[in-house]
Swiss-Prot record:
Substrate binds at W217, Y224, Q225, W226, R308. Keywords: Dioxygenase, DNA damage, DNA repair, Iron, Metal-binding, Oxidoreductase. 2-oxoglutarate binds at N267, F268, Y269, R370, V371, N372, I373, N374, T375, R376. Putative dioxygenase that may repair alkylated DNA or RNA by oxidative demethylation. Requires molecular oxygen, alpha-ketoglutarate and iron. Fe cation binds at H278, D280, H334. InterPro entries: Alkb (IPR004574), AlkB-like (IPR027450), AlkB-like_sf (IPR037151). Transmembrane segments: none annotated. This is Alpha-ketoglutarate-dependent dioxygenase alkB. It comes from Dictyostelium discoideum. PANTHER family: ALKYLATED DNA REPAIR PROTEIN ALKB-RELATED (PTHR16557), NUCLEIC ACID DIOXYGENASE ALKBH1 (PTHR16557:SF2).
């Protein structure tokens, strides 16, 4: 879940308004917030964007970030000696024989082709190196933008403005219009103009394109209630069958079955996004893992401990990678320190894709965006909509 990180180097200072008596005015300073080890590591990947005089530093002149401490499951030999000691090859532990994957699927590769790693000191943590082809990744990206962000699911925009239907489809129309205008080919009679969206009070909102750029998260299944931090049967929407099948197959292959995804958060990161160290502990069922799947740009993910006072392990998560946080890691702080600059997976770009898919990939690439889908079982005994797939299907 999201958490806002306050800058502990910034203190609130209250002074008298009477400048003439400033020498005798009482000044109070609130205690500086402790910089935890989690925050210290997170800040290693924070780029300085302003000079001492407050002016913006051009991107090309900024001090580059040192990514050498980041563990990389994709390039094992490029890791530091310290990080190499943390990597456990768990590929042989993947279950491929206890049941038959009898039918081919358009959504993922067969588990016998998966490469799976663990992390020393974190039993129950698994990293699956992307088990998707580029076309399979784009099917999930399409779902995330078209289906998962639309009503009846909640997102950060509809939470305040009410349901907004067809956010992507209308945003895409405006994106096409912008492109045609830039090429001098725009003709209002030929291009369908989406009606300006209205909020729940009937007041006009920004354009769909502007709203789309503000999209940060959406929720599936049980709609997480952010303020009280709970799930309620009162707020439930049907969980997508294909996503349910995918995460259950992942759970079976990594011996976390039976597993029923009852809720998911879909996060939409842009190049400047981070996520502070947090726990996912609102679920009644904590023995089942969080299954997290990412597409688009590369992130520096921080796998922490049960307290923020222990330094987390930074690791790269690339497009298509899956992280499974079970066992000890289910109870540990974690977050996203950085979306790596210019890291969008260029393998997702294909001139043979249809125009709609091209625009989705273009939208992700233009702001170095990342889509993350993370699922969890909420109750010890699955309730509304909870169902197990047939292992032998």
């Amino acid at each position: 879940m999201y958490e806002t990180e306050e800058d502990p180097t910034t203190s609130n200072v209250a002074t008298t308004n009477n400048e003439k008596t400033a020498s005798t005015a009482a000044t109070t300073t609130e205690p500086v917030k402790k910089v935890t080890e989690f925050m210290r590591v997170q800040r290693l990947f924070r780029q300085v964007t302003k000079s001492a005089n407050g002016k913006n530093i051009p991107k090309e002149k900024r001090e580059p970030i040192d990514y050498s401490p980041v563990l990389d499951f994709h390039n094992l030999e490029n890791n530091t000696e310290e990080n190499k000691k943390l990597i456990i090859d768990c590929t042989s532990n993947v279950t491929t024989h206890d049941f038959e994957f009898n039918r081919d699927t358009e959504f993922y590769l067969h588990p016998r082709e998966w490469k799976v790693y663990g992390l020393q000191g974190y039993p129950g943590f698994y990293f699956i190196k992307s088990p998707f082809t580029a076309s399979q990744q784009k099917k999930w990206i399409k779902h995330a933008l078209e289906d998962y962000a639309d009503p009846p699911n909640n997102n950060n925009i509809t939470l305040f403005h009410g349901p907004i239907k067809n956010l992507w489809k209308n945003g895409e129309k405006e994106l096409i219009n912008e492109e045609l205008k830039s090429q001098g080919k725009h003709d209002d009679d030929e291009i369908e103009q989406p009606t300006r969206p209205l909020d729940k009070n009937g007041e006009p909102l920004p354009t769909y394109r502007q709203l789309l750029d503000k999209l940060a998260w959406s929720t599936l299944g049980y709609q997480y209630q952010w303020t009280p931090r709970l799930y309620s049967e009162e707020f439930y929407e049907e969980f997508p069958d294909d996503l349910q099948e995918l995460v259950q197959k992942i759970a079976i292959a990594t011996k976390f079955d039976p597993y029923v995804a009852e809720a998911a958060t879909v996060n939409f990161y842009s190049e400047d996004s981070i996520m502070g160290g947090h726990l996912d502990d609102a679920e009644q069922e904590m023995e089942k893992p969080i299954i997290s799947i990412s597409f688009g740009s590369t992130a520096v993910f921080l796998m922490g401990a049960e307290t923020r006072d222990i330094a987390p392990v930074p690791l790269f998560i690339r497009s298509g990678d899956i992280v499974i946080m079970g066992g000890r890691s289910r109870y540990c702080y974690h977050g996203v320190a950085k979306i790596v600059e210019n890291s969008f997976d260029l393998g997702l770009i294909d001139e043979n894709d249809d125009q709609d898919l091209k625009y989705k990939i273009q939208w992700l690439k233009e702001k170095n965006r990342r889509v993350n889908i993370n699922t969890r079982q909420v109750f010890k005994v699955p309730k509304l909509g909870g169902k197990l797939i047939n292992k032998n299907e």
